[in-house]
Amino acid sequence: MPPPAPRITIHDLTMAYGSFVIQHDLTFSIAPGEIFIIMGGSGCGKSTLLRHLIGLMRPATGDILYDGASFWAATPADRERMLRRFGVLYQSGALWSSMTLAENIALPLGEYTDLSPREIREVVALKLALVGLAGFEDFYPAEISGGMRKRAGLARAMALDPDILFFDEPSAGLDPLSSRRLDDLILEIRDSLGATVVVVTHELASIFTIGDSGVFLDPETKTMLAVGDPKTLRDTSPEPKIRSFLRRGEAETTTAA
């Protein structure tokens, strides 16, 4: 049986700020239902690549396709439809501090759907329950922990039932236990919803726990050095930079592998 067609295809992508090139000649694909890790050292362009994938930055050259359809060659209306398929969890959680958790999650539902207020309340309760925050509808972001804010941000990212989820450093600022719980939640959501998940992270425990595949970006050569299963890259890559990155603190992360 042939493998499924890629959910996301990156073809000959060059990312730049004006004449300053961040990464060039990026070509890889992401399969449906895969948890794909964007990894590499500081300053390599991980978050810049994420901004390209969610339509916030236009490539200097190259293309990004979703289910075979070019994002930037599409009409504005078609691009808007593609964007509706995305859910994004930003590093800070990006919750509105003046709104309750319920109001934060209801915001995109009121903006982009025709659901009644009662139906919106039901969806909000369901999304909060999915991330373990049932009963926290009336809490404000400042009243809950950092890990809970990340989960609330994830609930909002799932509000419109996206089939592609993007996470920017989801474990940033979390203690190891909260980080592991968030990893478990990401796996559970992928398995239950069948979503494709793209994660920017430098956390080895998360990379090895949730990553099915990934791309390694190098800040020195300004291009990708490899694509593949992070554990396989750690164990068999001939590239010293990849082995060094993925074997940091190996003693602490052996159990996560």
Model-inferred region functions:
Residues 140-144, 148:
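Conserved ABC ATPase signature
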Residues 117-136:
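Conserved ABC ATPase "signature" region
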Residues 54:
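Helix-to-loop junction immediately C-terminal to a conserved catalytic motif
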Residues 165-168:
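Catalytic Walker B motif of ABC-type/P-loop ATPase nucleotide-binding domains
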Residues 159-163:
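A short, proline-enriched helix->beta-strand linker immediately N-terminal to the Walker B motif
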Residues 62-71:
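Conserved ABC transporter NBD signature motif
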